[in-house]
Swiss-Prot record:
Keyword Signal on entry: yes
Protein purpose: Part of the binding-protein-dependent transport system for uptake of C4-dicarboxylates. Responsible for growth on fumarate and succinate but not malate. Is not directly involved in C4-dicarboxylate uptake, but plays a sensory role in the DctS/DctR two-component system which regulates the expression of the dctA C4-dicarboxylate transporter.
Signal peptide: 1-18
Primary location group: secreted
Entry keywords, A to Z: Secreted, Signal, Sugar transport, Transport
Record's protein name: C4-dicarboxylate-binding protein DctB
Species per Swiss-Prot/TrEMBL record: Bacillus subtilis (strain 168)
Keyword Secreted set for record: yes
A Pfam family reported for this protein in Swiss-Prot or TrEMBL: DctP
Record-stated family: Belongs to the bacterial solute-binding protein 7 family.
Domain of life: Bacteria
Lineage: Bacteria, Bacillati, Bacillota, Bacilli, Bacillales
Length: 350
């Protein structure tokens, strides 16, 4: 019996030794091989970019282009994770998320920034810009600089301005040709007192609601209509639940790409260089592509929907401007006479 137990013990010891030697040969004496993806993940930095619109919009496409350029310029060492359609934060939540460090990049509509600094409301004034050249001149010049400077007190850093386009009006309550046609209508608008006051001036009842709730509000007849760019009307299919579209171009819709100042300063000079270069190239692309996209998608709406479309003539736009001019006087004490003057000068030049 003892000899049997001894034999068993020797066998177990032999097996254990063989296993150890085999394991050692495969791991201890050889370097573990990583594929390219695994190697990249060992030192990859990941930043989050949250926005609330669809990917097939000027902002959605710009965010993805920025991510691609950062990946390319960093050799895969910096990854921008893009969260579209409000999948991470709503347009009401994203600024706080940025300040809390839960996300590193956002691109809220400029209308949202009035809650941080009232001067941002100047971009919501009716017919603030009358064409894309005026937008570029204003935001790439003194007006854009002043607005980004106003964010510093909130420890936020403005990186770029991205354009969506000019806002149009959709409704189920008959064609909108004159300012009086909006009287008595309930309209969904962005969070902006300036926008609210201009629609009240025309006799409408504006409702400040989140962007991603708009389709449901229209579908359930909670509101009669809304204002938005062609790109947003197309991507969110508002034309399926609205009967009339007026090409009024009465307001500008754009975005301020932002990050947190503390986050930015914590990055290495090389990381900041890569992010800055990628943002510059993306912004130049957006300035050209946004205008083209809105034109193309208007043609798609014309071809593929039953919505009735009316385009204001230049003479009719002048009538709308005249009716809405009191909003400029109302907000001059808040925005400052100089900022208003610069905006009106751009209107003259365009």
């Amino acid at each position: 019996m003892k000899s049997l137990l001894a034999c068993l013990a020797l066998m177990i010891a032999g097996i254990a030794t063989a296993l150890f030697i085999g394991f050692h040969d495969h791991t201890g004496n050889k370097k573990i091989v990583y594929d390219d993806d695994q190697e990249g993940l060992q030192d990859q930095i990941v930043f989050k970019f949250s926005h609330v619109v669809a990917e097939n919009t000027p902002k959605g496409l710009a965010a993805n282009k920025f991510a691609d350029l950062v990946n390319e310029k960093s050799g895969g060492k910096i990854k921008i994770e893009v969260f579209p359609n409000g999948s991470l934060y709503s347009d009401i939540e994203e600024i706080e998320a940025l300040q809390n460090g839960d996300v590193q990049f956002i691109a809220p509509s400029t209308s949202k920034l009035g809650m941080l600094s009232p001067e941002w409301g100047v971009l919501d004034l009716p017919y603030a810009f009358t064409d894309y050249n005026a937008v570029k001149k204003g935001l790439n010049g003194s007006i854009g600089t002043q607005l980004f400077d106003s964010l510093k007190k909130n420890q936020l850093k403005g990186l770029a301005y991205w354009t969506n386009g000019f806002k149009q009006i959709t409704t189920n309550q008959g064609p909108v040709k004159t300012p009086d046609d909006l009287k008595g209508q309930d309209l969904r608008i962005m969070q902006s007192d300036v926008i609210e006051d201009q629609f009240k001036l025309l006799g409408a009842t504006p409702h400040q609601e989140s962007f991603n709730s708009t389709f449901q509000l229209l579908e359930n007849n909670v509101v009669d209509g809304e204002e938005n760019t062609i790109s947003n009307i197309y991507s969110k299919k508002f034309y399926n639940v609205q009967d009339y579209l007026t090409i009024s171009s009465h307001g500008y819709l754009g975005y301020a790409v932002m990050t947190d100042e503390h986050f930015w300063k914590a990055q290495t000079p090389e990381t900041r260089r890569i992010l800055t270069e990628a943002m510059k190239e993306t912004t130049e692309w957006n300035e050209t592509y946004a205008e083209q996209m809105n034109k193309e998608q208007l043609e798609e709406i014309k071809k593929n929907s039953a919505i009735h479309i009316y385009e204001l003539s230049d003479k009719e736009k002048q009538e709308w401007m005249k009716r809405l001019d009191p909003v400029y006087r109302q907000y001059e004490p808040i925005f400052g006479r100089e900022l208003i003057r610069e905006l009106l000068e751009l209107r003259k030049d365009s």
